[in-house]
Regions:
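N-terminal secretory signal peptides that target proteins for export/translocation
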Residues: 1-3
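Bacterial N-terminal signal peptides
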Residues: 6-16
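Short, solvent-exposed loop/turn segments at secondary-structure junctions
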Residues: 49-50, 103, 134-135, 181, ...
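A glycine-rich, often tryptophan-bearing local segment used as a flexible ligand/cofactor-contacting loop or short
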Residues: 103-181
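Extracellular ligand-binding/catalytic regions of CAZymes and related secreted enzymes
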Residues: 20-37, 61-67, 71, 212-214, ...
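Stable alpha-helical elements in mature extracytoplasmic
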Residues: 38, 61-65, 89, 113-117, ...
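Catalytic beta-strand/loop cores that center a nucleophilic Ser/Cys/Thr
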Residues: 22-29, 154-239
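Helical hinge/lid and interdomain linker segments adjacent to catalytic or ligand-binding clefts
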Residues: 24, 31, 44-45, 50-136
Length: 312
């Protein structure tokens, strides 16, 4: 075969890949209930479109978790947008994971859904909240989340922002199996949360230094130089587990192997499952980051810039 036919064949095979729509989410099967009650059901709730492209990619992030959880033995992951249309998929769930907007925008705040979630938590179902999903208004609901998860963000003392972060594991908790220190440049973070007491099941997992200029609350300013907790685990005294990681603002951060292990381990542990000795294995390729993205408008150009002078 000479070079021209080879080139034509190569282009023909490459065309479908080049034409793949990164916003096509039709390939993600939603609300597929478990066929076997012996499998550990983990329900992933993906929030709606938010922020700019490649940030707050809740659907795409949950789709990645869905794929990786399918690779774990004895697990049946179920994914839904916001909240299941068929609430039966929640029955028997070992863990509920929500990756989406916080600040009272969580889809389970609505009273009937809150009652359903509360019943699951009372029965020992695990809870995982990622990034700003930990942000709840002060009040009884926020107190409940703190008791389920081990921590909650309130604007009275909590701080948030974007900066380069060097993260390090602390302790020997099962969620840290296979997790090594890692950097997450430019990601978004929440810190200085209201945490449960350590003698009531709270365990810090990942800590790091934050810029002093990001300590925007009076309380946070009192602790300049302190390592801040960015991920934690919680063993509820009454039964059930919780895990949270406040990063994962930027979609590219899923490319960090230790972050993938941390989140996957946290989900498995919260579901009451044994975390593998080397942490949960995940198959990953850079192309995975360009799949199942939400359709979002590009950010508007910044105002205030001086117009470029035309050459005379």
């Amino acid at each position: 075969m000479n070079s021209l036919p080879r080139l034509i064949l190569f282009l023909a095979l490459s065309l479908p890949l080049c034409a793949a729509d990164p916003n096509d989410q039709s390939g993600v099967a939603l609300e597929v209930n478990s066929p076997d009650p012996k499998l550990a059901k983990i329900v992933l709730l993906a929030g709606g479109p938010s922020s700019k492209p490649m940030a707050h990619e809740y659907f795409a992030g949950c789709a990645l978790l869905l794929d990786w959880l399918k690779q774990q033995p004895g697990v049946w992951p179920v994914m839904a947008r916001d909240w299941p249309k068929d609430e039966q998929v929640l029955a028997g769930a070992k863990c509920v994971v929500y990756f989406g907007d916080g600040g009272g925008k969580q889809p389970f705040i609505e009273p009937s859904r809150w009652a359903r979630l509360s019943k699951l938590m009372a029965g020992g179902t695990g809870l995982v909240l990622l990034h700003q999903a930990v942000d709840f208004p002060k009040g009884p609901d926020g107190d409940k989340v703190k008791s389920w998860l081990g921590g909650v963000f309130h604007g009275d003392i909590g701080c948030r922002g974007h900066w380069d972060m060097d993260l390090k594991p602390v302790g020997t908790h099962p969620v840290l199996r296979g997790v090594k220190p890692f950097a997450a440049p430019g990601d978004g973070w929440l810190f200085n949360l209201h945490f449960a007491d350590k003698d009531k099941g709270f365990t810090p997992l990942i800590v790091g230094q934050v810029p002093d200029k990001s300590r925007t609350s009076a309380d946070a300013k009192k602790h300049a130089g302190r390592d801040e907790v960015m991920a934690w685990a919680h063993q509820r005294p009454e039964g059930g587990r919780g895990f949270s990681f406040t990063g994962v603002d930027l979609h590219k951060s899923w490319s960090y192997e230790s972050q993938r292990k941390l989140v996957m381990n946290g989900i498995l542990w919260s579901a009451g499952l044994e975390v593998p000795a080397d942490g949960a294995a995940t198959k990953f390729a850079e192309a995975d980051l360009n799949r199942n993205l939400d359709k979002k408008a590009a950010p508007a150009p910044k105002t205030g810039a001086k117009p470029t002078e035309k050459k005379k």
